[in-house]
Amino acid sequence: MASDSMSSKQARNHITKGKRQQQHQQIKNRSSISDGDGEDSFIFEANEAWKDFHGSLLRFYENGELCDVTLKVGSKLISCHKLVLACVIPYFRAMFLSEMAEAKQTLIEIRDFDGDAIEDLVKFVYSSRLTLTVDNVQPLLYAACILQVELVARACCEYMKLHFHPSNCLAVRAFAESHNRIDLMDMADQYACDHFTEVVECEDFVSVSPQHLHKLLSSSDLNIENEKQVYNAAIKWLLANPQHHSKWLDETLAQVRLPLLPVDFLMGVVAKEQIVKQNLKCRDLLDEARNYHLHLSSRAVPDFEYSIRTTPRKHTAGVLFCVGGRGGSGDPFRSIECYSINKNSWFFGPEMNSRRRHVGVISVEGKVYAVGGHDGNEHLGSMEMFDPLTNKWMMKASMNTKRRGIALASLGGPIYAIGGLDDNTCFNDVERYDIESDQWSTVAPMNTPRGGVGSVALVNHVYAVGGNDGMASLSSVERYDPHLDKWIEVKEMGQRRAGNGVSKLHGCLYVVGGFDDNSPLSSVERYDPRSNKWDYVAALTTPRGGVGIATVMGKIFAVGGHNGNAYLNTVEAFDPVLNRWELVGSVSHCRAGAGVAVCSCLTSQIRDVGHGSNNVVDCM
């Protein structure tokens, strides 16, 4: 009997459990279910209820039902619910949960607000919707900031950003500053930088605070064609604000990068400006600019100190060109890539007439010259010139000697083609090109043959650095004095190298990467002609033989090369202040033996030919 009783009880339990499971499954089919901890429990979730709840609150508000507080803003009365306000507006949450008298009041007066703005804000609390217009955005932003409704404040800032204009961006910036909206201040500043020359012509410009003017003029992001525009803006503000001269005259002029102004403008305009002449610190700034130009000339100022004022702004820094070279296929390129500093990206410019690897490249007076190299079949002596104004390459006079692995330098106008090699010989030949006459002539040869040499003009000499003499890579360095027509050896590098890049920065010569006799190098050395000494600086992030380098905005860019296993399309930049290399935007084509130079033109002048952005060729 006992066994029969147990069997009957187990059967009932089994039937009951089965019914529960069936009901559970039916409920699951109707709603969202998740199992709880108990075997026979479940959690019922009805997301639709939230929509009903939200809709009911909105209807209560619109119909004035169950309201327990009225906001009085001027003559406007807004009936609403304390709980709803406290859920969305931190200001009211703090008020209603405090011991303040307003916590128990049914009529709360809010002073110094726009009634329509508060009403719009309350409607947003109930509906999550807000209509922004040119007329209501400022009072709404003010209310959202004071009442701490960050969602609405951010929406107002984004709306105002969309409606920036040269005539209103400075006023918007001042409004943002008064409400400590750093995000909107930054947006307005960036717009003012992007449209600087238009903003300067607007009425508000002379009314900006000296602190704000200081911030604007110091920015490297100013969209200008030349530093004259910054100087003229500074003088315009200073002449309109004589009350600020005692404290801000020299501070304002110090934000103008006077050393980057042409000498004739410095002497003919800046030096004759009365407010500059009458201020001792302004005269010191003018002397700094003069000394910079002397330092760059043959009358060098040996102890000149570089600063931010000697560093071009982004829009006047020029365009970095990467020209020719070759990749994994072995075929030389005729393509060129141009670097946009603002976008940190490269685009393809008009192609050369000839394919060229191990080509010499230089920019002089706003034009780019590509000389010599190898086209895949033979060595070249030809030269072509790219003019950003026409976006075309034009053939110019050829060198006397066909060669690849040459280096180019420009000193006082002429272009020097230095060293190089062909299949039989490493050359010590040096040719000089006169741009006006379009003619080449020979000058004194180097003391040592140098193929794959690096070169740069520094102060009043042309330097030839490293290379290969046909037997081994070289650590020796020599420099050319055009007045003596003579090459003289200087202190040798610490590392033998060929296929290295050479550039100058802050009065020093930098040699980057290259090959020793066995492998590519990552080491970087710096030469100071004042002390005739070399020292090592931070190494590249990867070895780069056949690397192209150039200096842009106070940094040295190393483009492409070969790391011993593959051709590279990566690019890295050296910051001398941090003594560090960092990767920047990569070129599309993996390439070594390309020529790299900075052209003093605008990125917008170069026609983007529109191909190659996804065409990364075989790097192996």
UniProtKB/Swiss-Prot annotation:
Residue span, BTB domain: 67-134
Keywords, alphabetical: Acetylation, Kelch repeat, Repeat, Ubl conjugation pathway
Cellular component terms (Gene Ontology): Cul3-RING ubiquitin ligase complex; cytoplasm; nucleoplasm
Composition bias, Polar residues: 1-10, 23-34
Matches recorded under Pfam families: BACK (PF07707), BTB (PF00651), Kelch_1 (PF01344), Kelch_KLHDC2_KLHL20_DRC7 (PF24681)
Biological or metabolic pathway of the protein: Protein modification; protein ubiquitination
GO molecular-function term, one example from the UniProt record: ubiquitin-like ligase-substrate adaptor activity
Region of interest (Disordered), residue spans: 1-35
Residue ranges with Basic residues bias: 11-22
Alphabetical list of InterPro entries matching this protein: BACK, BTB-kelch_protein, BTB/POZ_dom, Gal_Oxase/kelch_b-propeller, Kelch-typ_b-propeller, Kelch_1, SKP1/BTB/POZ_sf
GO annotation terms (biological process): proteasome-mediated ubiquitin-dependent protein catabolic process; protein ubiquitination; ubiquitin-dependent protein catabolic process
Keyword Repeat: yes
Function: Substrate-specific adapter of a BCR (BTB-CUL3-RBX1) E3 ubiquitin ligase complex required for The BCR(KLHL8) ubiquitin ligase complex mediates ubiquitination and degradation of RAPSN.
PANTHER family recorded: KELCH PROTEIN, KELCH-LIKE PROTEIN 8
Annotated protein name in UniProt: Kelch-like protein 8
Species, as recorded: Homo sapiens (Human)
Native organism taxonomy: Eukaryota, Metazoa, Chordata, Craniata, Vertebrata
